[in-house]
């Protein structure tokens, strides 16, 4: 079933209002596979793929995605602890708004566990302290943005309460607050988003 689902996820994106690392809100369309954590803590997955054949129908794709997600939710309701909630919500299935002939599928995940189960990739979202408790080796893997000390010792302790996103895959990452520390295989782009396209390995991002 996962193979079918991944084929249906031909893309995910959306032109969204994103804050990035500055205080100014800018309107930037997603142009690559993306993970977003919203101000309210929602986890949204965006994937982008060509959808340029004349016989492709966005409405048919939307119907297929809705069917597949409904089936997934039915079989994985045990991943949700709150009554009235489902593991995944289909946020949108549209053509990309930049005219690039790409389909857009945006999915809201109940939590990181659902994301991992559905996408088959590691993802952790919580505080630095929680990440360390979960067994992630945060120390010595991150350095302050734009150069600076490694996150070790007292500096690590001072940042225990800050948020951290740990993820696999080649994606762009959009966060609601300023990025403070990054692993060596991640970097800020010109929009203040985190470019995680260097490799498939785990990336570490601390923000507040």
Go through each PLM region and give its residues.
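Bacterial signal peptide processing site
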Residues: 22-24
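N-terminal Sec/ER secretory leader and immediately downstream segment
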Residues: 27-90
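Bacterial N-terminal signal peptides that target proteins for export
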Residues: 1-8
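Mature, soluble, non-transmembrane domains
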Residues: 87-208
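Short, surface-exposed loop and linker segments with low hydrophobicity and enrichment for Pro/Ser/Thr
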Residues: 6, 34-40, 196-199
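Generic hydrophobic, helix-prone segments enriched in Leu/Val/Ile
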Residues: 1, 15, 62-67, 179-181, ...
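C-terminal motif of bacterial Sec signal peptides marking the signal peptidase cleavage site
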Residues: 17-20
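Gram-negative bacterial Sec-dependent N-terminal signal peptides
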Residues: 10-13
């Amino acid at each position: 079933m996962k193979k079918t689902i991944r084929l249906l996820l031909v893309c995910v994106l959306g032109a969204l209002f994103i804050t990035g690392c500055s205080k100014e809100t800018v309107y930037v369309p997603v142009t690559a596979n993306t993970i977003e954590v919203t101000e309210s803590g929602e986890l949204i997955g965006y994937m982008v793929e060509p959808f340029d054949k004349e016989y492709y129908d966005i409405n048919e794709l939307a119907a297929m995605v809705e069917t597949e997600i409904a089936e997934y939710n039915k079989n994985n309701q045990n991943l949700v602890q709150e009554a009235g909630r489902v593991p995944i919500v289909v946020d949108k299935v549209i053509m990309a708004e930049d005219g690039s002939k790409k389909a857009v599928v945006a999915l809201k995940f109940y939590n990181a566990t659902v994301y991992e189960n559905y996408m088959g990739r590691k993802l952790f979202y919580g505080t630095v302290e929680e990440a360390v408790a979960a067994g992630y080796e945060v120390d010595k893997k991150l350095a302050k943005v734009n150069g600076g000390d490694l996150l070790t010792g007292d500096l690590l302790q001072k940042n225990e309460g800050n948020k951290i996103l740990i993820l696999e895959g080649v994606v762009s990452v959009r966060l609601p607050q300023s990025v403070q520390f990054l692993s060596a295989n991640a970097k800020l782009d010109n929009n203040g988003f985190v470019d995680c396209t260097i490799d498939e390995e785990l990336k570490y991002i601390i923000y507040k």
